[in-house]
C-alpha cells in the first residue's frame, strides 16, 4: 500500500511526498531549525498558508528555480504571478486540483500581509490547507483556536494534522489540545514552536496531554525527520 511521507523541515515547513511532492510554507533561509538547503528541494507544488515572511519564506526563489506550481489564497497568488511565478489562486472553501491531489483552503484565525521593502501588499485571508491524496492531511497554518475546526473533521476527516503550539502568535499547547479534540486525527505533528524565544513550548507536555485525553498520537519530530502514514 502506498503511503504519504511527511517530512518536517523546522518551524511550519513540511514536505509531503505522495503522488506529488508538496512543500508547505517553505521558510528555509533564515530558519535556524531547517535541515535542508534550497537546492535540496524539488517540489511539484508549493502550498502557502499566508504572506508572513516565516511562511511565504523562499517560495519565489524555489518556484523560479524549479518551475513548480504554487497554490495560495487569491491575493497572494496575484502577488506571486507579478514575480513570474506559476501561481494558482483560490479562496476559503475552494479547492485546486493538480494531478491526483486536491488542495482545499480552510479558515485560519490570524493576520496576513506581505512586507516587501517597506511596502505592504494585501495578502487576503490567512488559511490552512487540507491536502487530499492517498490520505488526507491538514496543515493549520498560523492560527488561534476556533470552533470551526470541528467542521474540518466533519468534512475532511484528516488522518494527520500539523498544528502550531508555540503561543504568542498562534495557539499554545492548551489551546492546541482542544483543537485535537475537535479534529479527531490519528496523528498530530506539532509545529511553529522553539524556532524563536517568544514561541518556546513544552512539546513533551503537549504530547502527554493529548495522548492522555484523546486517541491521537503526537509525533515529536526533529528537522529532517519523517513519518509514513
Curated annotation (Swiss-Prot):
Keywords: Hydrolase. It comes from the Archaea. Gene3D superfamilies: Ribonuclease Z/Hydroxyacylglutathione hydrolase-like. The lineage of its organism: Archaea, Methanobacteriati, Methanobacteriota, Stenosarchaea group, Methanomicrobia. GO terms for molecular function: hydrolase activity. Belongs to the UPF0173 family. This is UPF0173 metal-dependent hydrolase UNCMA_04270.
Amino acid at each position: 500500500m502506498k503511503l504519504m511521507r511527511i517530512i518536517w523541515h523546522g518551524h511550519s515547513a513540511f514536505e509531503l511526498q505522495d503522488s506529488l511532492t508538496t512543500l508547505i510554507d517553505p521558510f528555509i533561509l533564515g530558519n535556524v531549525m531547517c535541515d535542508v538547503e534550497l537546492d535540496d528541494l524539488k517540489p511539484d507544488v508549493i502550498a502557502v498558508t499566508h504572506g508572513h515572511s516565516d511562511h511565504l519564506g523562499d517560495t519565489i526563489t524555489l518556484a523560479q528555480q524549479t518551475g513548480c506550481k504554487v497554490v495560495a489564497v487569491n491575493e497572494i497568488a496575484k502577488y506571486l504571478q507579478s514575480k513570474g511565478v506559476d501561481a494558482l489562486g483560490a479562496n476559503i472553501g475552494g479547492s485546486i486540483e493538480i494531478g491526483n491531489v486536491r488542495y482545499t483552503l480552510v479558515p485560519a484565525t490570524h493576520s496576513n500581509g506581505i512586507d516587501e521593502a517597506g511596502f505592504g501588499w494585501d495578502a487576503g485571508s490567512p488559511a490552512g490547507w487540507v491536502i487530499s491524496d492517498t490520505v488526507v492531511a491538514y496543515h493549520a497554518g498560523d492560527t488561534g483556536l476556533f470552533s470551526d475546526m470541528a467542521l474540518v473533521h466533519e468534512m475532511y476527516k484528516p488522518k494527520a494534522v500539523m498544528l502550531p503550539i508555540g503561543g504568542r502568535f498562534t495557539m499554545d499547547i492548551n489551546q492546541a489540545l482542544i483543537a485535537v479534540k475537535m479534529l479527531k486525527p490519528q496523528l498530530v505533528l506539532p509545529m511553529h514552536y522553539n524556532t524563536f524565544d517568544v514561541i518556546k513550548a513544552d512539546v513533551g507536555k503537549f504530547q502527554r496531554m493529548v495522548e492522555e485525553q484523546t486517541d491521537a498520537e503526537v509525533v515529536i519530530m526533529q528537522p529532517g525527520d519523517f513519518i509514513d502514514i
